[in-house]
Swiss-Prot record:
Its main location: cytoplasm. This is Ribosomal silencing factor RsfS. Interacts with ribosomal protein uL14 (rplN). In pre-50S ribosomal subunits interacts with uL14 (rplN), bL19 (rplS) and ObgE. PANTHER family: IOJAP SUPERFAMILY ORTHOLOG, MITOCHONDRIAL ASSEMBLY OF RIBOSOMAL LARGE SUBUNIT PROTEIN 1. The keyword Repressor applies. GO terms for molecular function: ribosomal large subunit binding. NCBIfam families: rsfS_iojap_ybeB. Disruption phenotype: Cell viability is dramatically reduced in stationary phase, cells have a 10 hour growth block upon transition from rich to poor medium. Protein translation in stationary phase is derepressed. It comes from the Bacteria. One of its GO terms (biological process) is negative regulation of ribosome biogenesis. GO terms for cellular component: cytosol.
Length: 105
């Protein structure tokens, strides 16, 4: 699974756990490491961890192997690397501070 199918899969899994403000950014030509970034907001550190863990578990169940997961210790911003898609699960405060949408659009 890759490209648009992977994007839709990830967005669906984030939506399963009520991730908020889900945005998919096409970063082809802007990033050498991925084609798409999906950014969403969790309401608490536990919610952020749950969303990221759900994406990882469902990806593995679908036969995908996440390349890495970063930020699990802090849980206000967790990054899940699925190759063609990188998922940023952030708390509201971190999302406002780093403004990834502005940086990559």
């Amino acid at each position: 699974m890759q490209g648009k199918a992977l994007q839709d899969f990830v967005i669906d899994k984030i939506d399963d756990l009520k991730g908020q403000d889900i945005i998919a950014l096409d970063v082809q030509g802007k990033s050498s490491i991925t084609d798409c970034m999906i950014i969403c907001t969790g309401t608490s550190s536990r919610h952020v961890m749950s969303i990221a863990d759900h994406v990882v578990q469902e990806s593995r169940a679908a036969g995908l192997l996440p390349l890495g997961v970063e930020g699990e210790n802090s849980a206000d911003w967790i990054v899940v690397d699925l190759g063609d898609v990188i998922v940023h699960v952030m708390q509201e405060e971190s999302r406002r501070l780093y403004e990834l949408e502005k940086l990559w659009s």
